[in-house]
């Protein structure tokens, strides 16, 4: 008996859609969901963010770090 191969469901980008949140460097609560506990930016294959939005997200996180809204590293 051959079983059907299992396909993992493709996650949808959380920043696409009508009521999706805007990526803003001042919104630290949103940005912290995409930073690991060590302070590193989480890759898009884990967070399911599209490539364009991942670049925007990384830019916003780096900008927030520069303005001391987010830490560069957590000890």
UniProtKB/Swiss-Prot annotation:
List GO terms (cellular component aspect).
cytosolic small ribosomal subunit
One GO biological-process annotation of the entry reads:
translation
Q: Which GO terms describe its molecular function?
A: small ribosomal subunit rRNA binding; structural constituent of ribosome
An example of a Pfam family matching this protein is Ribosomal_S18
What keywords appear on the UniProt entry? Ribonucleoprotein, Ribosomal protein, RNA-binding, rRNA-binding
Which InterPro entries does its entry note?
Ribosomal_bS18, Ribosomal_bS18_CS, Ribosomal_bS18_sf
Task performed by this protein: Binds as a heterodimer with protein bS6 to the central domain of the 16S rRNA, where it helps stabilize the platform of the 30S subunit.
Q: Could you say which protein family the record assigns here?
A: Belongs to the bacterial ribosomal protein bS18 family.
- Complex formation: Part of the 30S ribosomal subunit. Forms a tight heterodimer with protein bS6.
The entry's protein name is: Small ribosomal subunit protein bS18
Q: Which organism encodes this protein?
A: Roseobacter denitrificans (strain ATCC 33942 / OCh 114) (Erythrobacter sp. (strain OCh 114))
- Phylogenetic classification of the source organism: Bacteria, Pseudomonadati, Pseudomonadota, Alphaproteobacteria, Rhodobacterales
